[in-house]
Regions:
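Short glycine-centered helix-capping/turn motifs at secondary-structure transition points
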Residues: 34-38, 62, 155, 263
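Charged, often glycine-rich, active-site loop that binds/positions anionic groups
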Residues: 48-72
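A general "terminal functional-core" signal
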Residues: 2-7, 15, 66-341
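Residue-level marker of positions within ordered structural domains that often coincide
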Residues: 11, 35, 60, 104, ...
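N-terminal low-complexity, Ser/Thr- and acidic-residue-enriched intrinsically disordered segments
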Residues: 1-57
Length: 341
């Protein structure tokens, strides 16, 4: 099996929102932690910038042009949480481009003798709050949505599973694929919390009805809750949906050390969720792409990502974790019975 691939780019350090939790030091901390571990065997590549065609498959030209013009004018605030600097344009282009490169690496080489089964994009700013027509929540473009749409448009992938375990609901990703059965979007997030979306009853509409799976959890939820929801709700949903590609919107702000929420997930908890993902991906014989989202305690962020990637990149089979079924898992399994079969 080919070595896993990690996409990054120095432009991530040039996005400068000023005094802000989403800071360049996030990337510095991650790369230092990975370097200390020999990059976990990942082959490192520089991310290309996303093209206009790739961005416009998700976002209208008006939004893209607005971000570009604000950056070119010296920067400023899009909203109270979302601030750009002159360097933010290149950072955003390469962030979306890194996610696209993940897809190209995993599914873009038909007939390859030894394709990669794991690729990760380590970029900032994050993307999962960016809706089709609105940048928000620290996010300019929705990187994982651009990647999923690229997988389908450029490579003919019919079904993509996106698992978002950031502590904040991925409202932007939900918005993009709300009426689309070609993407199964599963989000585990604290409720109530910013951005205020992601109620359990939000399940998609039209052709996408039933293909949005929101799994809100109360403040104080830890390894048992998050792990059970992945293993006992997301994994059965994946088996029923039978995706050709799994993408993880990997935020690490559900960690017990993170200052922006009230999660209690530990490093081991992220590793457990990753083990569930790896086990079902192996069973379905599909590749896994990881796209960085949030995480604002530098130590928790870097440790959580390293713990997840160690499991996902492990040689040999990874056993599914043996976890008790949490009451929330039972409730959500009943709610999504039509999807789970």
């Amino acid at each position: 099996m080919a070595a896993p691939v990690l996409f990054h780019h120095p432009s991530s350090l040039e996005h400068d929102p000023g005094p802000h939790p989403e800071q360049p030091a996030r990337i510095v901390a991650i790369e230092r932690a990975l370097e200390e571990r020999g990059w976990l065997g990942f082959e490192r590549r520089l991310s290309p910038p996303a093209t206009r065609v790739q961005l416009e498959a998700v976002h209208p030209a008006r939004l893209i042009n607005g971000v570009q013009e604000l950056c070119a004018s010296g920067g400023g605030a899009i909203d109270g949480d979302t601030v750009v600097s002159p360097g933010s344009w290149e950072a955003a282009l390469h962030g979306a481009g890194g996610a696209v490169a993940v897809v190209d690496t995993l599914v873009g080489m038909p007939g390859a003798v030894d394709p990669a089964r794991l690729a990760v994009s380590v970029h900032r700013p994050p993307g999962h709050h960016a809706e089709a027509r609105r940048s928000m929540g620290f996010c300019l473009f929705n990187n994982v949505a651009v990647a999923a749409r690229h997988a389908r448009d450029a490579h003919g992938v019919r079904r993509v599973l996106i698992l978002d375990w950031d502590v904040h609901h991925g409202n932007g990703t939900q918005d993009v694929f709300w009426e689309d059965a070609g993407v199964l979007f599963c989000s585990i997030h604290q409720w109530p919390l910013y951005p205020g979306t992601g109620a359990a009853g939000e399940t998609g509409a039209g052709a996408g009805a039933g293909y949005t799976v929101n799994l809100p959890v109360p403040p104080g939820s830890g390894d048992d809750v998050f792990g059970s929801l992945v293993e006992h709700v997301v994994v059965p949903a994946a088996r029923a949906y039978d995706p050709e590609l799994i993408l993880v919107s990997a935020g690490f702000d559900a960690h017990l050390d993170d200052p922006l929420a009230d999660g209690r997930v530990t490093d081991a908890g992220f590793a457990t969720m990753a083990a569930s993902v790896r086990a079902v991906a192996d069973a379905l014989r599909v590749p896994v792409g990881v796209v960085l989202e949030g995480g604002y305690d530098l130590g928790a962020l870097s440790r959580g990502l390293v713990a997840s990637l160690e499991v996902l990149a492990a040689e040999g089979p990874v056993a599914a974790p043996e976890l008790d079924v949490h009451p929330l898992s039972e409730r959500y399994r009943a709610q999504h019975a039509a999807l789970l079969g």
